[in-house]
Amino acid sequence: MPGFTVIQFTQDQMRSLTGVSAETVRHWRKTVPYLATKTGKAARFSFAELLGLAVTHELVNCLGVHIGTVSIGVDALFRLLEDSAAPVLEGGIAIITPTAASVRDSGSWSIEPSASPTLAIPLNPLISRLQQHVLPVAPSPSQASLPFPPEAVRSKA
């Protein structure tokens, strides 16, 4: 799409926004093939990749899942997020298995029998947290703006 520039985040920005340490990213690069391409000081991350890192951080830190157990599923998640549009992700739930990943709409998601253990991470809280850091909400003005421009009024005296 001409004229459309994707914002790229540096490694320092990525660590600050996602809360993932440099050592952790280094370890994840060894186990997740998608992250293996993001090496060196020139590595840049898109918003979708930040979201993937935030989901992975939730899996590892909140759910206690070993990254090696779900590395193929996490790799699939990064590739899926890379190809997904932002409106699809909002309100979505990331479904990760040891070998696959998908994003489902939270309104239509239901528990389906699966052949393998499945982890579900809601994306909205993560997207909101990332957006809050990237685009802080400006304070609302104390006076509401007028829906029409002011006009000078003259009296006939």
Which sequence ranges carry the predicted segments?
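Polyanion-binding surface elements
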Residues: 1-28
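Alpha-helical DNA-recognition elements
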Residues: 27, 31, 76
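Short Lys/Arg-enriched helix C-cap and helix-to-coil transition segments
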Residues: 37-44
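A short, Lys/Arg-enriched interface patch at domain edges and termini
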Residues: 50-81
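Low-complexity intrinsically disordered segments
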Residues: 75-157
